[in-house]
């Protein structure tokens, strides 16, 4: 899953991509091609 500042381009990568809001964060989910998953505004783990 990618951590992005903006999901503007992430939602246009595949026609089946959807934006979902969960627990105050925005997620892009794509059931047909899961490599396009993304989240906005979460710190990366090191």
Curated annotation (Swiss-Prot):
GO cellular component, one term: ribonucleoprotein complex
Pfam family, one: Ribosomal_L36
One GO-annotated biological process of the protein: translation
Gene name of the record: rpmJ2
Record-level Gene Ontology MF annotations: structural constituent of ribosome
Protein known as: Large ribosomal subunit protein bL36B
Keywords from the named record: Ribonucleoprotein, Ribosomal protein
Annotated family: Belongs to the bacterial ribosomal protein bL36 family.
NCBIfam families: PRK00831.1, rpmJ_bact
């Amino acid at each position: 899953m990618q951590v992005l500042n903006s999901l503007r381009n992430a939602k246009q990568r595949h026609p089946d991509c959807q934006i979902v809001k969960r627990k105050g964060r925005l997620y892009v989910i794509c059931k047909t091609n899961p490599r396009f998953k993304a989240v906005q505004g979460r710190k990366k783990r090191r």
